[in-house]
Every structure is written in C-alpha cells, then in structure tokens.
C-alpha cells in the first residue's frame, strides 16, 4: 500500500457548456469523492489552449465551470477549487516532465492522433505535450487517485510512467535527501518521491452518448443542441430533449444483454441508472418489457428532479462574479502553497540552484 496521504485530483477544461455527460461522468463523481477524501478540483484553462489558442471568453468559461462545480455540491472550503493558470508551478513541472517523457510515448497517445487528424504537422506542440501537463497537474499535488473517463485512461497510464521514470532516474538523490516514500509497485516495494496514481473509473453511466446518435459520445461541439442536455437547461428543455431522444421501436429488454446492438436504448437506460444511482440491471427490472412511451416520461421526470436545481443554482452563482472569483483566488492561494512545497523538493532532487 502507498504511504502517501490519499488525495484526489481532477480537472475540467473551460471549453463550452457542461452537459449531462460531464455531470454523470465526472462532476457527480467529484461530489461523491469529497465525502471520503481530500480533493483538489481544477479548471484546467491552460489545457484549453492546446487545440485553440485564441479564445473570446476564456475567463467567463472558467467562471462557468466553477459555478457548475459549486452548484453541483462541491465544497470550496473543505476542498480546493481553482483555475490552473493561477499556479505557475503547473507549467514548471510540465517542462520537467517534458524532459522525462519520451517522444515515443507521446506518439502513441490516441487522443493526439484523433485531435490532430491527418494534419499532424500543423497540430500544436502543446497538443502533443498535453499528457505531460496533465501529469504535472496530478503529480504537483502528489495525488494518489484521479477520477477519469475511458478517454483519459491512456493519459493516466502515461502519468504513472512519468512518475516511475522520475523515481527511478533520481532514486539515489531521493534516498540521499530522505524525501522518498515507500510504496508497492506491482509485486515490488520501491522508494519514490511521486506516487503511482490510481484511476477511479466506473459507475453505471461513466460514458454518456448523444441523444441523437447512440454511437457517438455526448459532446458540447455537436451542432445539434438536441444531442445533449446542458447543465444550464431548464426543466422544460430537459423534458423536451428526452422526449425527442432517438430510440428504436422495440420494448425495453428485461436483461442487460438485451441492450446489445441497441445503442440508443442502452444510452437512455445508462442515463437513468446514473441519475438514480442504480445498476442498468435494476433499471431493467423496473422497466423491462415496457415501451419507450412509458420509459421516456419516467426518465424525463428523474432528469428534471436531479438536474433542474443545479441549473437554477448555476444561474444564481454565475450572477455573483465576485464570489466565483473569490473562490478561485482562495483556492489558487491554497493550491500554490502545496505546489511550491512539491517544487522546492523537485528542484533539490534535480539539482537546480535555489535561494
């Protein structure tokens, strides 16, 4: 077992409105984790520059994500909520990790291939190095656990590789300075400065698909607003989008295996499961054999019950810009203290001249 103090870190990019997929796949999990763990939740505004350098409303989008965190129930007094660019040590450690990571590792990242597409030569260096910054975000606070979606699992594996390589490359200095922590890596007990961070994955609705196409992930970039439920949608809009969600003509099955090859049905059952905190199997025990004309109204009622209060609270919080800025400022100051403590030791381990 790791001797590191358990700590959860996760971040969300401030690019576009948050939607149901973000809520069930990430934010709802953030809220649950804060009951059992110390947590740091970050609006990763520097990451948003990797795909698009010029933004018209980056500051307002940062406030909007923060408002969503707070409206969903994240407590900024018990935990830390801040935006990444307030803490300069993220960029400092990312540069060091650029020197630890291997180009071959980066070239294997499927998300870079997907986002760069066929025009890789015109992709930004920041997009290629995105996983190094993500590793720095996590390891700057020596976080032991990170809630991640399936699309970020590979990046977290790279974070673990970077931590292990740093620990191995500087093992003698870490031991000499007495800053190592004994931990279990596989079957081996090792001494390292950075933890080998564990993913927190899963839940019945970890991956939410488009309401218009069950084969595509729900996305804020989809041109059809009917494809997603935004966290800012009011009750009437939520109900309308669920009523119009694409389905097939068959009744719901009684077993989860019956959802195979029925992506839209599986998606709606998954949404119900995530909102109700049930398994898909339990949802089908209740609704198996019934038509979507029965299931959709029940899902709409549940979604309105769970999501409409968040939308209302988001609007209230976004209207108090001074409060949102104060939360981010306070969180940034607290995060900065932790970050500088880590970086002082990292500089000593590397041998950079300080003071």
Swiss-Prot record:
L-tryptophan binds at residue 137. Gene3D superfamilies: HUPs, Tyrosyl-Transfer RNA Synthetase. A motif ('KMSKS' region) lies at residues 217-221. GO terms for molecular function: ATP binding; tryptophan-tRNA ligase activity. A motif ('HIGH' region) lies at residues 14-22. GO terms for cellular component: cytosol. It comes from the Bacteria. Its EC number is 6.1.1.2. It is found in: Cytoplasm. The keyword Protein biosynthesis applies. It catalyses: tRNA(Trp) + L-tryptophan + ATP = L-tryptophyl-tRNA(Trp) + AMP + diphosphate + H(+). Keywords: Aminoacyl-tRNA synthetase, ATP-binding, Cytoplasm, Ligase, Nucleotide-binding, Protein biosynthesis. HAMAP family: Trp_tRNA_synth_B. Catalyzes the attachment of tryptophan to tRNA(Trp). Belongs to the class-I aminoacyl-tRNA synthetase family. This is Tryptophan--tRNA ligase. It comes from Mesorhizobium japonicum (strain LMG 29417 / CECT 9101 / MAFF 303099) (Mesorhizobium loti (strain MAFF 303099)). The gene is trpS.
